[in-house]
Amino acid sequence: MQQIRLDSQDGFYLAEPLDTWLTAGQHDFAIPEAGGSSARVFLYKHTSGKTPYSRDPAFKVMRHDKISYAKPLFLEEYNILANLRGVDNLTPMLQAGFLKPDSNTTWPSEIAPLTKQMEKQGQGVNIKGEMALFEVDEIEDVLAQFEERIQDGWLPFLILERRWEDNLYLLCDAGYTRGNFVRNLSMKQVLDISVQICTLLEEAHNRGASFLDHKLLHYYWNEFRQKVIIIDWNIGHWQPN
């Protein structure tokens, strides 16, 4: 476990929101459904521009005003992602931990960063505080400290690989793209995507994880690799026995 500071003046900080918009065909769209009921999600960056991650990841932190509702969801996601390591088509958890925001912290409005001004309004740079950071193989320590940390004002978080691919929801529903399908999928691709999703869910179920939040916006399509990738396991159950 590491104790580090979250501070946009020097070190790691929270940049643009990732939970208010989706991308497809190199275009961004404000999607209200992308917002989570239990967490906020921001781009996690460092002032130096250098991080130990291959690219800037996503920082998913429990909503400070929904703690009672969010607690069981975070517990499920910690357990599921820690135990599904190595499963293909899965967005991996890179690290996890707890954030204790400074007493004067003001959380940003949930605004899609579709302009520079909106990006400035929606970013999390003013969220500062102390972080207890754990590696994935230390997840048992996270679970053991979970209740006590929350009672002491800490908010659980996950650091996840950021999805950059086309969101499958926008490839299949033209409601937000003004009637345009930004990238047509062939029938073969649609069938392949369906098989990949079923194969992933079957393997997860065999390991003890049940996925219960079946929305297209939880899937991304990697055109280059012809691969579908899933996010968001907090609406799920970990039942290894």
Language-model regions, residue ranges each:
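Juxta-kinase regulatory segment immediately upstream of eukaryotic protein kinase catalytic domains
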Residues: 1-31
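ATP-binding glycine-rich loop module of kinase domains
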Residues: 38-83, 90-91, 97-127
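Conserved structural core of kinase catalytic domains
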Residues: 94-185
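Activation segment signature within eukaryotic-like protein kinase domains
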Residues: 193-194
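Conserved hydrophobic alpha-helix
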Residues: 197-204
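Catalytic-loop of the protein kinase fold
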Residues: 205-222
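Activation segment/activation loop of eukaryotic-type protein kinase catalytic domains
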Residues: 217, 222-241
